[in-house]
């Protein structure tokens, strides 16, 4: 899923674990043994629905993550990457109101610095020096995200058959990584 794996990770962070997964995977454009586009529609046990589109055929790099809530929404766009090709990183907070006539108030915050790598390294170093557990981005979280990516591939029956995928993911793989 290329950059899509980061979206899958974020979807799990905000929505929880997805128990139902439907997908369409295609490599019709580049015709390699990796997907050009992945579309997934997923649902958690508590009823949260998530939708994903990860594309290698969209000619402009895009990163867009939306969380729709009962009284508004959060929209994260762009990535502060080294290539600068994903556009400005912004968070738009939407405040819906029944009297807004379909034009809710929005506040956009633009981020000009990415301190996430530094913060991750500090947390990782601290966990080693202080013998603490990792709070964010544990091996188990990474495994669960990879497992969901695999479930997305397997949910497309044609893709699953074409690449001889099996729905069974040995839990012993996780035990070997921890």
Which stretches of residues belong to each language-model region?
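Phosphate/oxyanion-binding loops and surfaces in catalytic or ligand/nucleic-acid-binding neighborhoods
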Residues: 17, 70-77, 94, 149-159
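Oxidoreductase and adenylate-handling cofactor-binding alpha/beta cores
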Residues: 1-27, 40-48
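NAD(P)-dinucleotide binding in Rossmann-like oxidoreductases
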Residues: 28-35, 45-121, 135-138
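C-terminal helix-rich "cap/oligomerization" subdomain common to oxidoreductases
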Residues: 45, 126-178
